[in-house]
């Protein structure tokens, strides 16, 4: 196995490890404060009232944990996500018959969009966490929620493209083996 493939495998394993850490530990820890799920995983978004209620439920300790632990994990995750999944999507597109640098560009763009939205989401969430709940304005919440919902929507687009690529690979393989 080449050094680049080993590096990509390490990124993929690290991505899964960071994700598992968030899902098994930091997200339940935040939810345990009683205000519901963290902003990052609210697929359908949230409004100003929900955001302020969650920030109040977190209290100072929960907001500090979200800022210093969860958001640090969620800074590592999109970097690892981008490296591992853009490579995987480029490989799937190659197996599906899309040759050349175009497949790499498409893969990178498809994966970069939710990655960049995740970074923007994290910045907006960090801004909310560092304010007193009463000082969090509706515009900031709307922006953070917009980033959250678009991140998940664009990640779903990427998964759909990958699934279509896998379907093309399987159909081509079946066509070659069917008499």
Label every model-predicted segment.
Residues 2-70, 133-136:
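Interfacial loop at the N-terminal end of multi-pass membrane proteins
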């Amino acid at each position: 196995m080449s050094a680049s493939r080993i590096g990509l495998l390490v990124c993929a394993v690290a991505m899964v490890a960071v994700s598992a850490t968030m899902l098994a530990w930091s997200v339940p820890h935040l939810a345990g404060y009683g205000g519901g799920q963290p902003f990052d995983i609210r697929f359908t978004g949230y409004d100003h009232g929900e955001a302020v209620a969650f920030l109040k439920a977190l209290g100072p300790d929960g907001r500090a944990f979200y800022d210093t632990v969860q958001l640090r994990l969620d800074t590592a995750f999109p970097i690892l996500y981008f490296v591992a999944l853009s490579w995987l999507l480029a490989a799937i597109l190659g197996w599906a018959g899309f040759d050349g640098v175009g497949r790499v560009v498409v893969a990178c763009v498809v994966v970069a969009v939710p990655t960049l939205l995740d970074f923007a989401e994290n910045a907006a969430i960090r801004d909310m966490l560092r304010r007193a709940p009463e000082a969090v304005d509706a515009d900031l919440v709307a922006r953070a929620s917009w980033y959250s919902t678009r991140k998940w929507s664009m990640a779903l687009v990427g998964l759909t493209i990958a699934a279509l690529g896998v379907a093309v690979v399987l159909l081509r393989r079946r066509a070659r083996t069917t008499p």
